[in-house]
């Protein structure tokens, strides 16, 4: 599954105009296992998957601890093992200008960072700016860079 995800991320980045994508990969265990101190999943599962895609020409690096990998902003994408590992930093950067894109499926789809906001539905409190931003982003990704 990690290999498929990294290939999908690489293809999606190329589709939006990044010719040579650089992809960071988070670990499964805390701090990417600290060389086996906190588990062996990153040694046994994540590192071999990264090596497989690197052998196919994909510039993937890791595994990195999910709590610190975002500090290195030289990557074009950050792939994570768990949903919240990716959403937390994105929401901290800009809650109303953040969207989740799902790649590797037959249909490209996205959701706004705040979710459905059912708690404020029909109360006149909703701010459509996140939805508008998300629609602009996904329409650009669907069309591609050209």
Label each region the model flagged.
Residues 49-146:
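Glycine-rich phosphate/nucleotide-binding loop
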Residues 1-63:
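Glycine-rich phosphate/diphosphate-binding loop of Rossmann-like nucleotide-binding domains
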């Amino acid at each position: 599954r990690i290999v498929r995800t990294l290939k999908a991320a690489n293809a999606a980045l190329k589709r939006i105009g990044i010719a040579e994508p650089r992809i960071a990969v988070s670990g499964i265990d805390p701090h990417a296992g600290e060389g086996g101190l906190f588990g062996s999943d990153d040694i046994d599962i994540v590192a071999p998957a990264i090596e497989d895609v690197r052998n196919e020409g994909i510039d993937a690096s890791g595994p990195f601890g999910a709590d610190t990998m975002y500090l290195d902003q030289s990557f074009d994408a950050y792939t994570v093992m768990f949903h919240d590992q990716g959403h937390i930093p994105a929401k901290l950067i800009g809650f109303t200008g953040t969207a989740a894109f799902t790649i590797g499926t037959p249909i490209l789809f996205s959701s706004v960072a705040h979710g459905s906001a059912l708690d404020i539905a029909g109360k006149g409190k909703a701010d459509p700016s996140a939805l508008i931003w998300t629609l602009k982003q996904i329409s650009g990704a669907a069309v591609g860079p050209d």
